[in-house]
Amino acid sequence: MQELDLIIVGAGPVGLYAAFYAGMRGLSVAIIESAQVAGGQPQNLYPEKLIYDIAGLPAVTGADLTKNLLEQLAQISHRLFLGESVQKIEKEDGIFSVITDKSNRKAKAVLLTTGAGLLKPRKLGIDNEENLANEGKISYFITSLKEFEGKNVAVFGGGDSALDWSLMLEKVAKEVHLVHRRTAFRGHEMTVDRVMNSGIQVHTPYTFSNFNENDLELKKVKAEENLNFSIDKILVNYGFLTNQVSLAENLEVSRNGRVKADSMMQSNIEGLYVAGDASDYAGKMPLMSVGFGEAVHAINAMTKKLEFDHPLRGGHSSSIF
């Protein structure tokens, strides 16, 4: 394969948009993704969940967002390699070698859009949890809301995922119980208000105590008080454990394993950029909408370095298409 201007590692939303923007700025680009399907977390973990904070889209599911991004990407020349895991990235004489389990591709610049890395759901921590998960009694994310139609569902968690899924499940489930170990939720204020004004039964501050057949028992925090009700399914939204793997030697990362970036989203290795949840800097906000902007910064910066007659600021898309 010929030497490219840019290789993007990771085909989540930020990676897909970055590839489109790179093509719009005239760069030759390839994307490498370890999963068999592009789209990252929205496509693979919550394809039916509604996302509300993408500019210009009042609400969009993870699956539809991925579909839209792929349609946008189809407007420019690119190559997308799925099912390839990047093992390491090396740089020699100003050229990067991106070595995967299947190939060795070369580029003048690399953009990491690997998200939070390898994700492993946090579990309830009970003895028979694996068996209950195999039986479909316990889930950690939802790929199809149909599995919960007409069911009594308990959602454990206090963040945005637990709140959002509770609202989504209310539309299809018979009953939804939201269980949080604290009295206050950590999600967006508007979402918390929607939950509190819905038909969702909120139980705070309670924790899991026991689950036998369909009988769920909760224990009140710092009190000798239990609560029992019938449940068909449990959804655990305690977040994910992340495993960030450093792909390049001497790449500077922060304490949380994310790659340190400057104001132009470049790492300490010249020509190696980062955007989205894989990046870290002062004031970092781990939001998809922010990641799109970070990708634009990175692409414009590398375009300026690769093509010295190009301005740092890209033109308007309306003048290109």
Swiss-Prot record:
InterPro entries: FAD/NAD-bd_sf (IPR036188), FAD/NAD-binding_dom (IPR023753), Fd--NADP_Rdtase_type_2 (IPR022890), Ferredoxin-NADP_redctase_2 (IPR050097). FAD binds at residues 33, 41, 46, 86, 119, 277, 318. This is Ferredoxin--NADP reductase. Its cofactor is FAD. GO terms for molecular function: ferredoxin-NADP+ reductase activity; flavin adenine dinucleotide binding; NADP binding. It comes from the Bacteria. Keywords: FAD, Flavoprotein, NADP, Oxidoreductase. Belongs to the ferredoxin--NADP reductase type 2 family. It comes from Lactococcus lactis subsp. cremoris (strain SK11). It catalyses: 2 reduced [2Fe-2S]-[ferredoxin] + NADP(+) + H(+) = 2 oxidized [2Fe-2S]-[ferredoxin] + NADPH. Homodimer. Binds 1 FAD per subunit. Its EC number is 1.18.1.2. Pfam families: Pyr_redox_2.
